Amino acid sequence: EGTFYNSWGYFLSAEKMINDRHSISLATYGAPTKRSQSAAVTQEVYDFRGIYYNPYWGYQNGEKRSSRVVNSFDPTVVANWDFKITDKQNLKTGFGFHYSNYSNTALGFYNAADPRPDYYRNLPSYQINDVLGSYGLEDQQNHMDMIMSNVDQDLVDELTGQWVNNNTDVTQINWNSLYQSNYLNNVANPDGSAKYVLEERHNDLMTTALNSVYSNQINRRL
């Protein structure tokens, strides 16, 4: 759910025979790609929403928007020069250039509620586990009915209903709520930082290579 994949590729190659002794060739290729990601979730969430559930997206102005988008582009250029020195001597020289541009986005938050819809505190089970966690194992074994009476069952039922009925304001990222939180925070504290940010992490790499191979047939055997 909420995923997309856009990619295309190209390959161009050309060779020029300058004369009987020299030739040059050039090749370039790449595959610009933009795609969204999905995530593994807990069994509780799978039970509510099924195996295709993906917590990384939500609606913004009626359109699906993913918080995890990968952009990748790895253009490569290879050039070769073939020099026939004599009938027995040859020099081949090659140059390669490769640039890897890889980035992926993710939500960040500061002094604010976790925006992930499947964060454990946002699930119905947390309302039960939070109460159980305040009692020891012996109390849980001997006084379970008393302990469970302290659980806000109405809240558990409400959250369960929202997940089962797929209230996307709860089950997916609530983009409008994030923007509203940032807006209100900016009104109250104009010099402060945003509560929520969409960061883009880059891992870029540039590589060049140069090699030259000389061959010479000394005699019929070498």
Residue positions per predicted region:
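Acidic/polar loop-and-plug regions of large Gram-negative outer-membrane beta-barrel proteins
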Residues: 15-17, 23-80, 103-199
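Residues that define the transmembrane beta-barrel architecture of outer-membrane proteins
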Residues: 4-8, 71-75, 204-208
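Residues on the lipid-exposed face of transmembrane beta-strands in outer-membrane beta-barrel proteins
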Residues: 12-16, 77-83, 93, 210-216
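Transmembrane beta-barrel strands of outer-membrane/channel proteins
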Residues: 1, 10, 26-32, 95-97
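Transmembrane beta-strands of outer-membrane beta-barrel proteins
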Residues: 24-26, 91-95, 220-222
